[in-house]
């Protein structure tokens, strides 16, 4: 994914999500998947719910969803992980001669931006299991003060701050900084 400014996408909508996948960890033996709502709010999200919702948000047809879910199930089965999938409510939206599958009971703000991320994990079962077992997802936005942006930029010890009244730049210490941030692969979703 392309990052432009402070490891966060420069966009007009400005929802930003940071995703951290441990480079090494033990796997869980059970994962419960539910559709969720992931937008601009400052929240820590469940990786399984985020990924399950992302599968729907990055798929245009029911068969595409089914194919991705089967790949996910095959990976979980190969790692001896039991699972449960909550209900996903969908409808088909038509635009001209094109038809799109849409979620009714959840969303990820500009979720289609996660297409490469979803495909990468479905093609790397070990990384997917690490993400679902011990991964981190932080949602937020970049329409706010740097103190709030620290919530999603946990791999940055200091963030740039600009005071518009004095036209001065400074650095602020990130209270959410993760000293072990190098133990994770980081991904950024924004738009």
What annotation goes with each model-predicted range?
Residues 1-2, 8, 15-191:
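Long, non-globular targeting/processing and low-complexity regions
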């Amino acid at each position: 994914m392309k990052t432009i400014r402070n490891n966060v996408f420069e966009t007009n909508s400005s929802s930003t999500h940071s995703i951290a996948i441990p480079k090494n960890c033990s796997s869980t033996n059970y994962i419960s998947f539910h559709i969720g709502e992931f937008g601009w709010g400052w929240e820590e999200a469940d990786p399984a719910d985020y990924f399950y919702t992302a599968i729907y948000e990055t798929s245009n047809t029911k068969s595409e969803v089914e194919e991705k879910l089967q790949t996910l199930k095959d990976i979980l089965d190969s790692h001896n992980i039991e699972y449960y999938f909550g209900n996903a409510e969908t409808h088909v939206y038509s635009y001209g001669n094109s038809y799109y599958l849409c979620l009714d009971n959840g969303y990820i703000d500009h979720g289609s931006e996660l297409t490469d991320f979803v495909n990468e994990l479905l093609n790397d079962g070990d990384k997917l299991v690490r993400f679902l077992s011990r991964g981190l997802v932080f949602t937020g936005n970049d329409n706010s003060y740097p103190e709030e942006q620290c919530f999603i930029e946990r791999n940055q010890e200091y963030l740039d701050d600009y005071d518009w009244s004095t036209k001065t730049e400074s650095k602020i210490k990130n209270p959410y900084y993760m000293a072990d941030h190098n133990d994770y692969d980081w991904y950024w979703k924004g738009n």
